Amino acid sequence: MSRAPLPLAAHERLIFALDVPSHDEAIAWVDRLGDSVAFYKIGMELLASGEYFHVLDALAKRDKRVFVDLKFFDIPATVAGTIRRLAQWPVSYCTVHGWHAGMLQAAADANHGAMRLLAVTVLTSMGRPDLAAMGIDREPVDVVVERALAAEAAGIDGVIASGQEAGPIRRATGPAFSIVCPGIRPGGPVADDQQRIVGVAQAFTDGADAIVVGRPIRLAADPAAAAAAIQAEILAAVGQDRS
């Protein structure tokens, strides 16, 4: 059974995707954004830099929440061992692929409540043609909800999924199940590699607990102001005390 969603203040519901190649660039972004962002996602690009855990430690020392987005996908024993080691670090969220029930169960058993584990369902860069090319001739929403239910049954705490599926996931799963949505585009659709996108208010109206935003902040003329504007939208959508 999944646990209650991670208690989040309104300003912690914006997660900035720290998709940069080095420790120095990562910390420069944290300093640039200041109090406008309290939660950071660190992924594979920083892992390849060799400085991943230096960044994680630096974020923790700045009292920032950390989302480890490495999408673990391996045999159950390997994933379980990785989760046990990662649980020693100050991590709030961590992703595992949601396509193998035995692996999900092993991850949940190894976690012992240290982090909130999120199952990756269908990447927001994928649409129905991409699923069909993998031999899955179904709508993304149907696959996402199926994966969310399997993750919940395995004891995983939530999913990372497009805001387009937040409503169906919320209706299908229990109130303790966390929904974190990437592919958020505050200014509306743009020409990039994300396909299944929504706006800030819509994601929270449909049941998201937190959103991941990268390029709309990173490419803004004033990134801190862009983050602050998103924070204002979140506060209007969820209020100060929703958890």
UniProtKB/Swiss-Prot annotation:
It catalyses: orotidine 5'-phosphate + H(+) = UMP + CO2. InterPro entries: Aldolase_TIM, OMPdecase, OMPdecase_AS, OMPdecase_bac, OMPdeCOase_dom, RibuloseP-bd_barrel. Pfam families: OMPdecase. It is an enzyme of class 4 (lyase). One of its GO terms (molecular function) is orotidine-5'-phosphate decarboxylase activity. Substrate binds at residues 19, 41, 69-78, 124, 185, 194, 214-215. SMART domains: OMPdecase. The active site is at 71 (proton donor). CDD domains: OMP_decarboxylase_like (cd04725). Signal peptide: none annotated. The keyword Lyase applies. Its EC number is 4.1.1.23. Pathway: Pyrimidine metabolism; UMP biosynthesis via de novo pathway; UMP from orotate: step 2/2. It comes from the Bacteria. Keywords: Decarboxylase, Lyase, Pyrimidine biosynthesis. One of its GO terms (cellular component) is cytosol. Catalyzes the decarboxylation of orotidine 5'-monophosphate (OMP) to uridine 5'-monophosphate (UMP). Homodimer. Belongs to the OMP decarboxylase family. Type 1 subfamily. This is Orotidine 5'-phosphate decarboxylase. It comes from Xanthomonas oryzae pv. oryzae (strain KACC10331 / KXO85). The gene is pyrF.
